[in-house]
Amino acid sequence: MAGEHLGVAISASFSGILRRVSTVYGTALLVQGAETLLSDRAVDARVKAARRENPQAELIKLEGREVDAGRFVEATGGSLFSQATIVVVNAVSDLDKDLFDLVTTTAANPPDTLCLILVHPGGTKGKGLLTRLSKAKVETVKVDAPKPWAIPDFIAKEARRGHLDMDHDAVNALHQALGNDLRTLAAAVDQLASDSPNGRVGAQAVTTYFG
């Protein structure tokens, strides 16, 4: 009987651990890099995960240049109207350096009801905050722009993402026509996918659209 109780207790404890690991609440994410499409997608993915977990969560978006200590504490300290809060702080590079310790402390140990997302646009501005967040081992997603030679791979992945069959020549034709801007390329792939009833496109079609 004692063994049975012990087994139940262990099972319950393990389930609790799994729930804590899988939740995005009580966590912070730093999205760092200059590629805005990838940055937006990383933020959107975390917000969607938080919303799936708690559809009633309040979403608060802040701009680094407008944040002071009082506003940050108010946003991250919990809501009177919701049991959970998603806080996105854009351009943390613009935060006053006097806030670096406060932001780092919160990111290192967020309340269980908070999903915190910090967005840094790359570059050296706000480096002191990045150093602190790194030392605090805050989860980080790097969203740097791919090298030009890696752009065809990005296009191919976008095509698969949109269930579009693009051969090698079509991928290269799109790259040559539109260059290296990821947002432009992603929009072009979306257009090709929506205008291709058979889900397949070749180099000639790409040239017709964008050549």
List the model feature ranges, each with a label.
Residues 2-211:
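Conserved beta/loop motifs at nucleotide-recognition and modification sites
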